[in-house]
């Protein structure tokens, strides 16, 4: 295994033993949940977690922090982006070592029972466009089943790259190639930064030879960095 690994964390995950996690150089950082819609924010928790990364000599070299917003489909996307940005600024803003923001686009927890392609694409685009104006960067779009079901496309949603969830041993469905699977998810290999291979809950999954638990954490959402260029590309994104 040569690809780097990054975990997703939110307040209900297991507590992290940060010295143990940071000592293993296979792990290149963490992406923290910061906000959800216009209703929830986790800035106090997020800042406490972030401080462990910022004080590491690895930070900005082979260790990065990232922040994600859980998008809600019944609230304006641009206002969600402004709220996300306000809380990110509150905990120190984007640093040289911070990955572009990630917007989580999925079905779970939504008040809209049957979202349409136009609705999801439009709200995500509003979020991404507003984030781009605030930060000068393009957001990463995280998604899986919903994007495939609706036929949503990364470019139409305004994302600069993708993070794809598929809990399987290989990055494709039965009888298709990776390229075909990513096309169904609205992206391509050149623009895919992360493959989320394991979740904190459910049966352990993932490709052969890759960990299904993180040191100092245990079961957690695990992402493999598959962005072409690997660490150098990730470092450039976080610069």
Task: Show the residue positions of the predicted features.
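Functionally critical loop-and-helix segments that line ligand-binding/catalytic clefts
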Residues: 1-13, 21-24, 155-239
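Basic/polar, cationic surfaces and motifs that engage anionic cell-wall
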Residues: 115, 119, 136, 142-145, ...
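Alpha-helix initiation/capping motif
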Residues: 43, 144, 153, 221-223
